[in-house]
Amino acid sequence: TKAQLARWVDYANQKGAVIIYDAAYEAYISQEDVPHSIYECEGARTCAIELRSFSKNAGFTGLRLGYTVVPKDLKVNDVSLHSLWARRHGTKYNGAPYIVQRAGEAVYSAKGEAQLKQQIAYYMKNAACILQGLRDAGYRVSGGVNAPYIWLETPKGMGSWQFFDELLENAGVAGTPGAGFGPNGEGYFRLTAFGSYE
């Protein structure tokens, strides 16, 4: 929620820490109390960098188009991170290919925005269906509300890779074993709503 995120912003400002905030799924947010940007929180411009991607909202996975917001107010030890980022980026990065830039431009056209809203609504309908189906089948689940991913606890203490094999072999369903996200992901499994409703 915005209140929870605001507490992190306050903490970062008190400790002199920098938050790197991944807003890749911003377009999927539907709940009013969940911010679309960390900069909706007072004080975030002095402690946060926000990452934005076209991969999740516009299906640009593999094309690598996104942007980073580094506020001019963000300083560490009195050094502007905005200036350092601009210098680094201007020296090391030559920009996205022209055709990818044009595709990114199309995302912000009236037609592009309408198509993306329609596509996101479709994926979220899928997420709601998967979420309810898993609940009805007795699984402990979460997610599928402000992002197109549904997490479930693997049954009977089964390892996430073992559950992956079982689902693939017996149901023809592929997903992502939680162990792939690190040791705390073990015992969980992630399904995606990026598919056809049927």
What spans do the regions from the language model cover?
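PLP-dependent class I/II
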Residues: 1-198
